[in-house]
Amino acid sequence: MIINKPSRVRPDGRGKVTGELKYMTDLSFPGMLYGKVLRSAYPHAEIVSVCTIKAEKMEGVQAVVTHKDVPGLNRFGIVIPDQPVLCEDRVRYVGDAIAAVAAETEEIAEAALELIQVEYKELEVMDSPEKALRPNAQRLHEDGNILHRAFFSNGDVEEGFQASDTVFEETYELPRQMHTYMETEGGVAVPEDDGGFTMYAGTQHGYKDRFQLARIFDIPEEKIRIVSSPMGGSFGGKDELNIQPYAALLALKSGRPVKIHQTRKESVRSGIKRHPMKITIKTGADHSGNLLAHDVKIVADTGAYATLGPAVLDFSVEHAAGPYRIPNIRTEGISVFTNNGVAGEFRGFGGNQITFALETHLDRLSGMLGIDPLELRRKNIRKPHDLGPLEHRIAPTDGAAQVLNAISKSPILKKTSRNCGYLQRGTGAAITMHGGGLGFGRMDAAGGRLSLSSEGKITASFGFEECGQGILAAIEQIVMEELGCAAEDISIVIGDTAKVPKSGSSTASRGTSMVWHAIQRLKKPFLAQLKKRAAEWSGCSAENLIPGAAGLRDKNTKALVVTYKELAEKGPLAEETAFDFPTTPDPVVGGHFLYSFGAAAVEVEVDLLTGDVKLIDCEHAIAAGPVVSPQGYRGQIEGGAAMALGYTLMEEAKMTDGRYAAENLDHYLIPGIKDVPDMKLIAIEDLMKGDVYGPRGVGEIGTIAITPAIVKAVHDAVGCWINKLPISREELLEAIDRKGLKQWT
């Protein structure tokens, strides 16, 4: 069905469009200093010495810190704390921090960095997984250059290939991508009288930041307050610590608030990126199109440090067969340390890379078999009660068939290839599935609180962050629908560890789903408290009262009996819940329990003179349960598609010898409004009978299927297959030339 639920203005909408909303990097405090971080001059080197005397003596400089100033663990990392806060004896990439300065102005702090003398001894740069995996390669970490291995096997792959009539093998290469959020990493650390501090900085998990910072500063977590919302975009890039340790070190040393706001160049050098991957797939099928064997090898460049590299690889391995049943499968993944930029959490979380390779591979295999690409998928699509992709138990779902059937009817796919001289058009489609939550048996706690404030507002408190994804709108909509109150009756508190319960991370397409689950648990006891108090106040029977706009109303007449403000005068009232994200009963096997499904159909235009590829038309079909916030749902899918468009056609954070080729957006192009056409969206809200898990997340699913769909459409237009992203104009022109379609001399 098409979304027909009315849209609402987001709670933060007015503040954003008027510019009145204050982001963390907009904040200032009395006596505030400005901080800068000295990053490594080399991608790989020993640190012989560091001298900060000249910087310390510079007028206007109030604090300089090195690793000697870190009171606790001089390491950070969400899962594996392997990245130095401030390097002691070695740097492993150009984003490594060596020292930090706080001064009266940003210009003075910048100048002071130039006065810090660092003597290096350069080391060989491991700038590719191939180089880092050589037998004699220098070890980047004590345990070697392999961060993580992941493996899954089912059936007998070799027997499957022997039984196949057609076997096809190909290698696909995926690029490093920048998050390019509008607000680069930044914030303010404010020292407190008890020896702790308040950190105002964008993050996707305030409580996790608090845990890491407490470990670094060797102080109780309760002495650290994290205020993390709102922020101007994240997409996974602010899930890990960035400027927080440096601002806090400088604030505690100087005794004054310290603000650090990275320039785009600083963000590029130090920030997390999407994992580059090289994926080799070998697939066998019989003459009817039944997939019999599937062998996948994944090599991921995780850069200098771990962050969430292991989880990204696990996710790719889990989704290596996508929404298809293949009896014989073997998937091997390896994540390799290099001296390149750190790769980690990024919208799609490894699903983008493996889905491009898989879906493109199936399109090519269908051509060899002489079978329609969508028919090949239909023959092998997962059934509602099949086990999950790792042969684990999951919530029964027919989402894969739903999106396949919906996108098969797209008017886009009814168009035929068109030759308009030097402009040729083609169409393509692809489907995908995406696990929600952390998965793999990992701790995935959630929670929330409903309370009645002294002002008479129903206050919904969650430990989530507003990254621009619309969690505020989702909370408001769910509370309105489940409690029957009006938007004016609601107050929302998020992004402040001093005020909210633990809800887990604002990642993994889990936020909206967890809010829905929390309110399901909270509404009955919370309403019971409201009704009991209202009955005592009014003399009415609690059974005859229902919540509504402004207060409790008579169930029959709908007349207002008592306002929320009047109920609040009797004292505080609250209910809190804590629970876990739904997980598979097979945590040893791993994988996710809830999945969203998506499909995309596209039309592209290829310029035979320039090699340009333009997206002309696009339609999405998404199966992710009930729609909570229509404009938020659509925004996630369309915004995700725009991000995927950049990944497919233009974005690559190239590195040579461990250095970025582009350190600003004047040389790293992302899609503009003219690159993105109007998009159609089919939201499939139906869940299987007995499904009690409500809405699934859609924050990532829109970024995935569009890439292989575009690649298929390019082939439909000019007959050339693309194995490497982003699509290179030069390589496409060479392929066009080989096809005899050359339009120039």
Swiss-Prot record:
Q: Which UniProt keywords apply?
A: Metal-binding, Molybdenum, NAD, Oxidoreductase, Purine metabolism
**SMART domains, alphabetized:** Ald_Xan_dh_C (SM01008)
Question: Which InterPro entries does the UniProt entry name for this protein?
Answer: Ald_Oxase/Xan_DH_a/b, Ald_Oxase/Xan_DH_a/b_sf, Ald_Oxase/xanthine_DH-like, AldOxase/xan_DH_MoCoBD1, AldOxase/xan_DH_MoCoBD2, AldOxase/xan_DH_Mopterin-bd_sf, Xanthine_dehydrogenase_dsu
Catalyzes what?
Answer: xanthine + NAD(+) + H2O = urate + NADH + H(+); hypoxanthine + NAD(+) + H2O = xanthine + NADH + H(+)
EC assignment: the record states: 1.17.1.4
Which GO BP terms sit in this record? Answer: hypoxanthine catabolic process
- Top enzyme category: oxidoreductase
Kindly give the Gene3D superfamilies that the UniProt entry links to this protein.
Aldehyde oxidase/xanthine dehydrogenase, a/b hammerhead (3.90.1170.50), Aldehyde oxidase/xanthine dehydrogenase, molybdopterin binding domain (3.30.365.10)
Expression is induced as follows: Expression is very low in excess nitrogen (glutamate plus ammonia) and is induced during limiting-nitrogen conditions (glutamate). Expression decreases when allantoin is added during limiting-nitrogen conditions.
Any one GO molecular function term = xanthine dehydrogenase activity
**Record: residues binding Mo-molybdopterin:** Q204, F235, A508
Required cofactor(s) = Mo-molybdopterin
**How does the cofactor attach, per the note?**
Binds 1 Mo-molybdopterin (Mo-MPT) cofactor per subunit.
Q: In which pathway does it act?
A: Purine metabolism; hypoxanthine degradation; urate from hypoxanthine: step 1/2; Purine metabolism; hypoxanthine degradation; urate from hypoxanthine: step 2/2
Write down a Pfam family by its short name. Answer: MoCoBD_2
Instruction: Give the protein's function.
Output: Oxidizes hypoxanthine and xanthine to uric acid.
Q: Which family does the entry's similarity section mention?
A: Belongs to the xanthine dehydrogenase family.
The record describes its quaternary structure and partners as:
Could be composed of four subunits: PucA, PucC, PucD and PucE.
- What's the name of the protein? Probable xanthine dehydrogenase subunit D
Q: Which organism is it from?
A: Bacillus subtilis (strain 168)
